[in-house]
Every structure is written in C-alpha cells, then in structure tokens.
Swiss-Prot record:
Organism: Arabidopsis thaliana (Mouse-ear cress)
Description of the deletion phenotype: Plants are hypersensitive to osmotic stress and abscisic acid (ABA) during germination and early seedling growth.
GO molecular function, one term: calcium-dependent phospholipid binding
Any one GO BP annotation for this protein: response to heat
Protein name: Annexin D4
Positions carrying Phosphothreonine: T115
Domain notes for this protein: A pair of annexin repeats may form one binding site for calcium and phospholipid.
Ranges: Annexin repeats: 1-75, 86-157, 169-240, 241-316
Annotated function: May be involved in osmotic stress and abscisic acid signaling in a calcium-dependent manner.
Tissue: Expressed mainly in roots and flowers. Lower in stems and leaves.
Length: 319
C-alpha cells in the first residue's frame, strides 16, 4: 500500500528535523485520520525515528524520537506557563535554574540583573525570598566561587539610578579606571574592586558615557577588548547594548544546528521582553540590521504550529 501524500509530507518534515514546535493541525488531519496500515507505512518510512525489530515483527520508536517529540510539544506549554507567571517570579526561577546548572549558565544571571529595570530586579529578589526562603544574593554567594562571585552578587544587588543626569567627568574617570584594568588584567579585570564597583553601582546612562570615553581613550571598542566568553563581556554587552545581546541569542536559538539548551533561549527572550514595547522594538530593529530579515519572518520560517503563533502574537504586542 502506498503512503498517502499527506503522510509522506509529514514523514519528510519529521525526518528532516526542520524547525521547532509541532504543526498540531497537520498531525490531527493526517495521523488522526490515518488507517492502521498507513501508520505502519509511516513508521517504516521514518527510519530516523523508528527501527524495525525483525525478530518480534514490529517497528519501535527510538528513545531519542520520544524525547524529541516531548520536547517539541512542550515548547508551547512552557511559553504559556512562563508568560502567565508574574515577571518577578519568572526571573527568580530563571536565576535559580542557572545556579542549579552551574557555571555554564551564569550568563543568565547576568542577563536578568543587567537588562531589567531597578524595580523589576528588586521585585525578582523579593520573589526569590518567597519562593526559596533565602535571598538571591545569599544563594549566589553559596554556589559561585572565585572572582565571578563578587561580580554576580554585586549585579543582582544593584538598584541603579534611572534618571537622566550624568556627571561626565565622573564617567570619564571611570573609563580611565576600566581602560587600565582591562589593559593590565584582561579577563581578570573582573577581580578588581573598582571594576566591580563601576559595573554594579553606576546608572546605565553613566555607563553609556563611560563607553564613549573608553573608546576615545583607547582608540578601540571596549566590547572588543574583553573575551566574548567571559562574564565581564556578558555584563558589558547587556548593560551597554541589550538589543544587540538579545538579537544575537535569538539568532543562535533559531539556528538549525542549535543544541537543546540554546533553542530554549527563544522562549525566554520572547516572554520576558514582550511586555516592554520600546525594548522589543529595539530588538526587532537590531535583528533586522544584523541579519537582513525581520524577526517575524525568521519565526515564520523556522517555527511551527501553536508555538509559532504564540511567539508571533507576543512579537506583535510592540507593533
């Protein structure tokens, strides 16, 4: 018996592993209405996900296929749950998850502490008390060791001034301090108290002035002088160019070769930034400038089903 055209298309799509999410309507209209014989042909045709047990005469699922489908079906559910949460709780849980994962996820703590408003970061710390019966600062201090601890505790403890006044002389002085620290210590600049003080106490507008003065003093870009893999670089780019930061991690999450962890960044960025129209518009503009297509086009191209529709709905909130 020949495989129906609809199931043949579905087989090709699943075998290719293209996109994220699941086209629920296609599954309902094809698999849901298919005959038993058709589903057997479907299993035989999908060799990437099914293997034939010749001794027992049936086609069994590869374990990785089961995990793959569970993950793809869960993307929409995860996004909805995260969107329904209070933003403070959402950020508190993100920080807790990062601490559980360890050093490879500490950049998420930097993201939360450096891209949120002073009130939202304070709210996340309050939520942390309620959820985990300890302070965020205390938990970070007990889990993180070495020079990273001082920076991370300082960043999450910050309550930055958000007014429009800047003492330019002070920003220039801080730029000189940072220039000397980066020149003499490189990545180890994060160990210097003055560097931590500047990054954890100064307003974001002050840091923008510092950035301008640093580039004039050094004749080179501050962000290019620090290793891109370091927490110091993560903090700088989140504080100075958040739209660039989010655009890059969105693009990484939409890459066909992205790993499971990286693909999850997509949901995180959308649900945490969608309520902030100005920020989301800056991200959309930066993404378009960097990659030559709109974020909406990329989502339409790469994502499937209800997950795609939900992301596009969140994206349209800032239109």
């Amino acid at each position: 018996m020949a495989l129906p055209l609809e199931l043949e298309s579905l087989t090709e799509a699943i075998s290719a592993g293209m996109g994220m999410g699941v086209d629920e309507n296609a599954l309902i209209s094809t698999l849901g209405k298919s005959q038993k014989e058709h589903r057997k042909l479907f299993r035989k045709a999908s060799k990437s996900f099914f293997v034939e047990d010749e001794e027992r005469a049936f086609e069994k699922c590869h374990d990785h296929f089961v995990r793959h489908l569970k993950l793809e079906f869960s993307r929409f559910n995860t996004a909805v749950v995260m969107w329904a949460m209070h933003p403070w709780e959402r950020d508190a849980r993100l920080v807790k998850k990062a601490l559980k994962k360890g050093e490879e996820a500490y950049n998420l703590i930097v993201e939360v502490s450096c891209t949120r408003s002073a009130e939202d970061l304070l709210g996340a710390r309050k939520a942390y008390h309620s959820l985990f019966d300890q302070s965020m600062e205390e938990d970070i201090a007990s889990h993180v060791h070495g020079p990273q601890r001082k920076l991370l505790v300082g960043l999450v403890s910050a309550y930055r001034y958000e007014g429009n006044k800047v003492k330019d002389d002070s920003a220039k002085s801080d730029a000189k301090i940072l220039a000397e620290a980066v020149a003499s210590s490189g990545e180890e600049a994060v160990e210097k108290d003055e560097v931590v003080r500047i990054l954890t106490t100064r307003s974001k507008l002050h840091l923008q002035h510092l950035y301008k003065h640093f580039n004039e003093i050094k004749g080179s870009d501050l962000l290019g002088g620090v290793s891109k893999s370091s927490l110091l670089n993560e903090a700088l780019i989140c504080l100075l160019k958040p739209a660039l930061y989010f655009s890059k991690i969105l693009d990484a999450s939409l890459n066909k070769d992205a790993d499971k962890t990286t693909k999850k960044w997509l949901t995180r960025v959308f649900v945490t930034r969608a309520d902030h129209s100005d920020e989301m518009n800056e991200i959309k503009e930066e993404y378009n400038n960097l990659y030559g297509e709109t974020l909406a086009q990329r989502i339409q191209e790469k994502i499937k089903g209800n997950y795609r529709d939900f992301l596009l709905t969140l994206l349209s909130k800032s239109d």
